[in-house]
A protein has these predicted regions:
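Short, structured surface patches at the beginning of a domain
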Residues: 1-145
Length: 145
């Protein structure tokens, strides 16, 4: 049997920012949810780029059923809508469970005890994650102006 892992993804845009600042919070959340052994990926790279070395490594190494744990959607993506859809496709293709620390419905979904609750939370999460990804992209565009 393959043991499930939690792949913590930490990203900051510049070397001046501390990508690891949220590590303890994410490790604590992982432990509280009992998700599995942690593997940490730290990246200082723009969230507007789909092709990121550590994110690619994470997706390459991930196994079906592993958890991808991020602090917030904007740490995962500031991508265009098309690129974000591609990233979501890759995450789903690998069979990763996306858990977002500041989006409690993502971890409520994995704790759901019945299929109806799970399905409802999955729909809510998909909508919220898409909305938050769009807001992260718009926020990035405003900063550039």
């Amino acid at each position: 049997m393959i043991e499930m892992n939690t792949r913590i993804y930490l990203r900051a845009s510049t070397k001046d920012q501390d990508a690891k600042r949220a590590l303890q919070i994410l490790q604590d959340l992982n432990q509280n949810l009992n998700l599995g052994e942690t593997i940490v990926y730290v990246e200082n790279y723009s969230g507007t780029k789909l092709d990121r070395p550590e994110l690619n490594k994470l997706l390459s190494e991930a196994n079906q059923g592993d958890t991808l744990l991020v602090e917030s959607i904007d740490r995962l993506s500031r991508l265009t809508q098309r690129d974000f859809q591609e990233l979501k496709r890759r995450i789903q293709e690998k069979g990763l469970r996306l858990v977002v620390a500041d989006l409690p419905t993502t971890y409520q979904m994995i704790q759901a005890s019945d299929s109806i609750t799970h399905s409802i939370l999955e729909l809510i999460n998909n909508m919220l994650i898409d909305l938050l990804a769009t807001m992260a992209r718009l926020d990035n565009e405003k900063r550039i102006e």
